[in-house]
């Protein structure tokens, strides 16, 4: 089953990889997806596990079977419509971000401008 937050879609392969990575963390964590300044195109994607105590009232949240994905409102402006996928290919593998709001992306796909 894909995860759809209404603003971010997470594919089955991405959900599977997130679940694998989550196993390396304690149980009381969620995955935070966001953007930050930096990267070759001006902004870069961020994904990290953080303790659920850090959840803010303004965060958007998607509850899945064994974890939650959250996003802050400022990042949401840049991520609306984002599709998060995962590829296990040797070249070009890893998490892949497809962002309809990005006017320009860098070659690695991890940085964009909006």
From Swiss-Prot:
Q: Give the keywords, sorted.
A: Chloroplast, Iron, Metal-binding, Plastid
Compartments reported by the entry = Plastid, Chloroplast
InterPro entries cross-referenced by the UniProt entry: FeS_biogenesis, FeS_cluster_insertion, FeS_cluster_insertion_CS, HesB-like_dom_sf, ISCA_plant_cyanobact
Q: Does the keyword Transferase apply?
A: no
Using the UniProt record, give the first listed, main subcellular location: plastid
Q: Which Gene3D superfamilies match?
A: HesB-like domain (2.60.300.12)
For this protein, the record's Pfam families field holds:
Fe-S_biosyn (PF01521)
GO terms of molecular function: iron-sulfur cluster binding; metal ion binding; protein-macromolecule adaptor activity
* Residues annotated as signal peptide: none
Classify the source by domain of life.
Eukaryota
**Which cysteine pairs are covalently linked by disulfides here?**
none
| One biological process term in Gene Ontology | iron-sulfur cluster assembly
One GO CC term on file: chloroplast stroma
Q: Any idea which positions bind Fe cation?
A: 40, 106, 108
Entry's family note: Belongs to the HesB/IscA family. Ycf83 subfamily.
Name of the molecule in the record: Uncharacterized protein ycf83
């Amino acid at each position: 089953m894909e995860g759809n937050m209404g603003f971010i879609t997470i594919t089955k392969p991405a959900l599977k990889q997130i679940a694998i990575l989550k196993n390396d963390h304690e149980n009381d964590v969620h995955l935070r997806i966001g953007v930050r300044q930096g990267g070759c195109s001006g902004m870069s994607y961020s994904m990290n596990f953080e303790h659920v105590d850090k959840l803010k009232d303004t965060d958007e949240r998607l509850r899945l079977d064994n974890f939650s994905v959250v996003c802050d409102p400022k990042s949401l402006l840049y991520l609306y419509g984002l599709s998060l996928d995962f590829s296990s290919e040797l070249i070009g593998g890893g998490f892949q971000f497809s962002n309809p709001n990005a006017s320009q992306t860098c070659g690695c796909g991890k940085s964009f401008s909006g």
